[in-house]
Amino acid sequence: MKITLFFLLFAFTSFGQDSPRVEEKKKAEAIAKQHLQEMQGGFLLVRLDDKKTEIDYYLKYQNDDEAKKVKEKQEKINEQIRLAFTKYFTMCPVYFFYMSDTRNLLDKNYEMMNITDALLQSVSSLDLSSGKFYVAEFGIANQDEVTNDENVNDGVYTERMAVSALVIRTSEMLELRDPFPYFVRYNIMGGVKSRYLGPVKKMQEKLNAFGAY
């Protein structure tokens, strides 16, 4: 009789409490939902490569023709990225800045940054000091991840192979974590006019689906 009561009490206690694994999963989901809400109430900064280091190198050695080629090629790519976000991204307002301003962003020298809209018009009214914004770019997703639910309990993370992707980061350029849909793979060899449209569209769809979850 005592043994039966013991097992009943044990079973009741076990079912009445979530395991550490479940608690960690709930915590991760709550953090991800909070990021989504903050994004909806804030804005997105898209980092564009301006090839400044490469262009400055050619200019240093008076190779103006090569510098011009690099600049024009990158401008065409950036134009397609701006077009993709304008056409498909509706989660929050989107603005753009160049990679050469990354140090200003990280050092919070926001007044030194050149931020523009999709039409390349300078935007000076944004409040970056609040930190209520996220950064996106076509780059590399290489964050560690929990590969299955069992690993959540003991905090074991395995390194994900770095992949070319559209990535969303925090205002401090840190990658978000699952289950937030923070990256979408893309084909760096695809045609310039179609390379960026698909990933941005898919990112918006994933954000919509996560918000409805």
Model-predicted segments: where are they?
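Bacterial Sec-dependent N-terminal signal peptides
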Residues: 1-23
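Short beta-strand and adjacent turn/loop elements
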Residues: 18-213
